[in-house]
Amino acid sequence: MRICILGATGLVGSELLTLIARAWPTAELALYASRDQTLAHGGDTHEVQAASSLERGDAPGGDLAFVALDDQYSARYCPRLVELGYRVIDKSNTYRMNPEVPLVVAGVNHHRATSATKLVANPNCTTIPLTLALEPLRARFGLGEITVSSYQAISGAGLAPLSRFVDMTVEGFTRMQTAGELWGELLDPAEYPGNVVPHSGKTDDSGFSSEERKLVNESRKILELPELGISAQCCRVPVPAGHYENVWIELERGADAEEISEALASGPFVHYHPGADGAGLTALATVHRRDHALVGRLRKDNRDTDGRRWCLTVAADNLRLGAATNAVRIASAWFPASDPLLGIPSLRQA
């Protein structure tokens, strides 16, 4: 089995390498990035080729390709990989809303990745945990309206912003300790350290950001509810990793807390934490490198009169579940994974 990763030197590429070693430990790897280089990962050194080499007439084919590139490069290389015989899972926004390309969350609509499918779009890092939490509620009670506020880590913006964030944070605290300067005096309001940015991504003419549009449109497509009433406010917060979402839900049919808790706990790749205090959801270490969504803080909305309006919190590692883990689970529909935790429900042993 030959597996290709485009964008192997990035944050998602690194997580893919870790998971591939668990899922397909004997696979041959073909790694690509913007230029020829070497990559140290997990105690091994890998040769990385320039992605442009795939455009040569003698470029080798393979079985499975993960593409973790910006939109313009995904549009350039995904068709070429399909042409070379790969089944392709693309992390960019390029194909997500294309009606001819399935947008898949393992545990929600993985049936869309069939034996005939050659290209699958991997959803945005906030959409994946949100739809994992919503799907068991949709199945049992129906969904009316959804309102989401997300708090998204710096790593969701990419390696360069994360590196700058770490450098500026260390520099700021060092200056505080050595020069006695106040943290607030050191901050650039245009930079991430110490600031909560009230949008994530570029805003359009309506004022909504690209992250907010993705969350709304992708959720409708994945849940197969094109008319779902859903609105989102996405913020960037000064933490390195981990996305949090506070979700207000209106169900079509009323239910009590026990019924909703049972539904959430039954969801594939969901770890449900009972109790309204959010215990188990607050620490960064709780979500770091976890391959599931954490759901908790379930409580009835204070305007509820019939058991239809509820609030809850969803947390996940944006680089793992929100990107690499979902991609690997999708691929397990075609190539069964050695690690059962990286399979999808219809293929996993009970």
Model feature map: region roles:
Residues A65, I154-A350:
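Charged docking surfaces used in two-component/phosphorelay signaling
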Residues M1-Y192, G229, A293-L294, L298-D306, ...:
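N-terminal Rossmann-like NAD(P) cofactor-binding subdomain of oxidoreductases
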